[in-house]
């Protein structure tokens, strides 16, 4: 590597340049080659290595290079054979333009030693460019008045080639008007031109299309063309000419103003202003013509501007002229003859006199609606008139006299289908062409009250939650009346039905205009489950028409009643219940029972029992049944247990939110040999438990007798009213019997509230009531019960079947098919290992049935009145001291039914069970009265004995 004097390589390019310059002088030489333009790639140009005296083997070692000096890679050298060839397309016109000489200058540089050779490659021209005109089309405008031999210069073509290839010759397409003037070689300044050799006529030849062709002198010849479009300009050398010299037109005498008479047409062969024509009447036209006709100056249309009368003038002769706008102007003339024709120019005239408008839709057929008269001023056939009516209408025209008609009713009317008719009466004369006139008759159809209000459906079902606010909107009834005005004005009212002492108006009301139904008082599901009534819709027509719709209002239950405790509460114990238990009892022994009832339904009435946390400790040897409320021992009692146990039992329903009640049970543990001289049930202010219980039983018996008497009187009154009522005057839809019970246990009594279904509608009344006295099995029957054992005297242990005469309420009978028994042994069973909880199962009997047990519902969808009663023998276990007698509850009402366990040899008086609503009732009254007295004595003795046992 060479370095400069400062020791860096910056001096190397300078040194290399000096060496190249030196070798240039030593090895300079020049070669000449030629190649035609547009030669293909690889075309041989020359053996450059051989011509330069270089060996083929030294081309690569000596770094043979070819420099075209900015000409690109048009030429290239094959280093294997030293041949110079064409590498890419060579276009002479692109390289040198129109220059006569065109060469490519090359430099060949070889190294070791450095030599430079000059090579000139001449590019020879070929005829590869055709002649080209400046434009493909040339427009020439020549007036038809130009004289002969007029010359019009043209622009020639150009050829990019040179020499013979650029030598052009011209020729013109054959025609009779022009020839081509081509300058000779001595007239280079004179341009190419067209020479006119025949006069032009625009009307004959408005345009000429010529083709000018240029041909070069190359081999092969190439040509170029240009279209010559020659437009001949017009001169005013033609006058306007009409199609005809005489136009004949016929017009009726009643032609209207503005009617086009004729449109004479004139044409001018000239164009532009020379061909624009102006129409007018001739100057010698009469004033009468000018008063009746008008001619448009531009279009030449003649129109009527005055009245024409055949009797006044039968023909009008109109001279017309057409003048162009050329200079000088030229004119053409014609005549228009207008003949007036007598025609039927008077149309019929209609006169209508209406008599009965509007027409009632119940009008009789043939009713005259209007009188029509027609007139025509013409004579003969032109004055003969016929009338017609709009088709497909319930009316017709009846001819009564010449040119007189009556419009009468032809078919029955229905305003609800069509409320009005627009009739068109057409009168047509016999002229040719006939003339007609029309008149409209509006016929309104008056409404009659022939449509009753109609409801969308015959019955509606509405669900309303209980405890609604008074005046609450519960539903809206709507009836549609197809009539109009007063006949369609609907008012609503309740179909009044009295339900005992209460009227339907005390429950609901309906707005007379809007049809909105309102609850007048808070509805109570426990009192009223279904309110069925009818709403009447009546229009204001004469006579008024109406229709009824049935509304079934179901009152949905809400948890608005807390559980009510039925456990007897003695005076002096602050509402607590006292029980005595022997210390010798073992585990799983029932020592007491907490009884509660919920007036709600479904889940809202499903009760569960549990001990309060403060009393449910491990040291307390008692537990309470989750669904039975029975208090039983969890283990055997011993001396370490406190002699007095205070239990707090929480009674909770399953409503949302849940409501609760708390019962306090005081359990006293006594020894087996200890006589209960005093009891926590005793009161400080009481003279003795026996006296208190006896007094209470007396009052209870009196109350039962009073209630029974009231029921008997009610039944008798109902029977009388039913027998005297019409079969169609039912106040209640067919319903199910309602169970009414009363019972006495210990020193308290409760009676079930009466659950009603208040209905108002068609159908006979039905009120089936049933009552039974305390201490009896709830089986009904008068003669069928003979020989049936009591609930406590059944020694076989099989469940006792209810008497077929037992009649359930609607909800109770519904529960017979899907009841769930929560048995004492099926819910919680105590054992040595602690309580064993089992889920309720659907069954008809349990391993340890309890006489008179009622099964509570499992789901919220089961009504509390749908529980199934079971009757069977009592629990074989003997009741412990202080244990309450077995009972069953009817959820949904505060009623409690006691099933007393009588001795095995005791006999139940069948007459103590009374069933109301039976046909045999009147035959058994005396027998039942005796049975009631005997049973009351027995009950009084049993109650005294039971109290003393406790």
UniProtKB/Swiss-Prot annotation:
This is Protocadherin alpha-9. PXXP repeats lie at residues 734-737, 799-802, 832-835, 873-876, 891-894. Residues 30-133, 134-242, 243-350, 351-455, 456-565, 588-678 form the Cadherin domain. GO terms for biological process: homophilic cell adhesion via plasma membrane adhesion molecules; nervous system development. GO terms for molecular function: calcium ion binding. PROSITE patterns: CADHERIN_1, CADHERIN_2. InterPro entries: Cadherin-like_dom, Cadherin-like_sf, Cadherin_CBD, Cadherin_CS, Cadherin_N, Protocadherin/Cadherin-CA. Residues 789-798 have a biased composition (Polar residues).
